[in-house]
Curated annotation (Swiss-Prot):
This is Formate-dependent phosphoribosylglycinamide formyltransferase. The gene is purT. One of its GO terms (molecular function) is ATP binding. NCBIfam families: PRK09288.1, purT. It catalyses: N(1)-(5-phospho-beta-D-ribosyl)glycinamide + formate + ATP = N(2)-formyl-N(1)-(5-phospho-beta-D-ribosyl)glycinamide + ADP + phosphate + H(+).
Length: 392
């Protein structure tokens, strides 16, 4: 049985978000719907989830001492990581002391870098993956590329949104790719993974919920990537029954091996009936923002329901839907959005994240749309996103 207290009262149930971006903001809103007290933590002030939290803190979450201090001060009942760049050793220690880390500290530690989760998937679970090698020096990087072959992809073992990633076609690109990978890691320079290129028809995110009443799957989410980050996503992605069954089997193995309750974003390559594991995030996924319009329970609502120990029951998918990012390029600490009235309409919504500033290219919002089919939904979402004019 789940007992929930009322926010700001002595018996309050407290949730601390480690990472307060747009995904954390939606988790915070779902917690607010249940009267939960929300504490948002990030490395910069006025992050999106801080706008809808009861309190907020600005710290370097890779600093073990600072992380322990804020958790000890706030005494949350649930610690909910939104990003990878966290001192996960400290989370394991705190979990050992009785704190509840979502979905569990082991999952956050294994998935904070690509090495932990790749070794779990390929070497422990025996799941199909791309060929890969790890390297921690430029010399071993050259050896790894030689072993994997061209073309290949290099990524920092700890990065997100395409930072530090390069597609390598020839030896002439190696020096530049190594340097870029060293600059792009979330925790600074360090180890990289070199992956062989997988031939696939499309990529999916299989949003998978591990809850008290078992493992549940959302309809597969298709997406288009550019520069290592998603541009559009849609649901449902059409695929064969056999491929879907295999995708669900892989996702089930991964989330049960990681442990804990919550929603996981399992990324997979699909080629015909074959399915290859790519990555997993033990939290809501950016491509899953489409579920804000496509399902009765969004990925954020499912995450909260699961980690609070509530049954999921069933997930209702309404029909074809899509999301398209609002991705301007400018420099400003006073961003405004014009022409929003022309973007919204029947079956079309806009979410603006409330990020405090932009310096270059940054995702500041998302358009959501339904349609008679996925193709129409994508067109409607992209058109809506393009109509929003970002100024600063």
């Amino acid at each position: 049985m789940t007992l929930l207290g009322t926010a700001l009262r002595p018996a309050a149930t407290r949730v601390m978000l480690l990472g307060a971006g747009e995904l954390g903001k939606e988790v915070a809103i779902e917690c607010q719907r249940l009267g939960i007290e929300v504490i948002a933590v990030d490395r910069y002030p006025d992050a999106p989830a801080m706008h809808v939290a009861h309190r907020s803190h600005v710290i370097n979450m890779l600093d073990s001492e600072a992380l322990r201090h804020v958790i000890t001060e706030e005494k949350p009942h649930y610690i909910v990581p939104e990003i990878e760049a966290i001192a996960t050793d400290t989370l394991r220690e705190l979990e050992g002391e009785g704190l509840n880390v979502v979905p569990c500290a082991r999952a956050t530690q294994l998935t904070m870098n690509r090495e932990g989760i790749r070794r779990l998937a390929a070497e422990e679970l025996g799941l199909p993956t791309s060929t890969y090698r790890f390297a921690d020096s430029e010399a071993s990087f050259h050896d790894a590329v030689a072993a994997v072959g061209f073309p290949c992809i290099v990524k920092p073992v700890m990065s997100s949104s395409g930072k530090g990633q390069s597609f390598i076609r020839s030896a002439e690109q190696l020096a530049q790719a190594w340097e870029y990978a060293q600059q792009g890691g979330r925790a600074g320079a360090g180890r990289v993974i070199v992956e062989g290129v997988v031939k696939f028809d499309f990529e999916i995110t299989l949003l998978t919920v591990s809850a008290v009443d078992g493992v549940h799957f959302c309809a597969p989410v298709g997406h288009r990537q550019q520069d290592g980050d998603y541009r559009e996503s849609w649901q449902p992605q059409q695929m064969s029954e056999l491929a879907l069954k295999r995708a669900q089997e892989i996702a089930r193995h991964v989330v049960l091996a990681l442990g804990g309750h919550g929603l996981f974003g399992v990324e997979l390559f699909v080629c015909g009936d074959e399915v290859i594991f790519s990555e997993v995030s033990p939290r809501p996924h950016d491509t899953g923002m489409v579920t804000l319009i496509s399902q009765d329970l969004s990925e954020f609502a499912l995450h909260v329901r699961a980690f609070l120990g509530m049954p999921v029951g069933a997930i209702r998918q309404y029909g074809p839907a899509a999301s398209a990012v609002i991705l301007p390029q400018l420099t400003s600490q006073n961003v405004t959005f014009d022409n929003v009235h022309a973007a919204v309409g029947a079956g079309v919504q806009v979410r603006l994240f409330g990020k405090p500033e932009i310096d270059g290219t940054r995702r500041l919002g998302v358009a959501l749309a339904t349609g008679e089919n996925v193709e129409e939904a994508v067109i409607r979402a992209k058109k809506a996103a393009s109509r929003v004019t970002v100024k600063g």
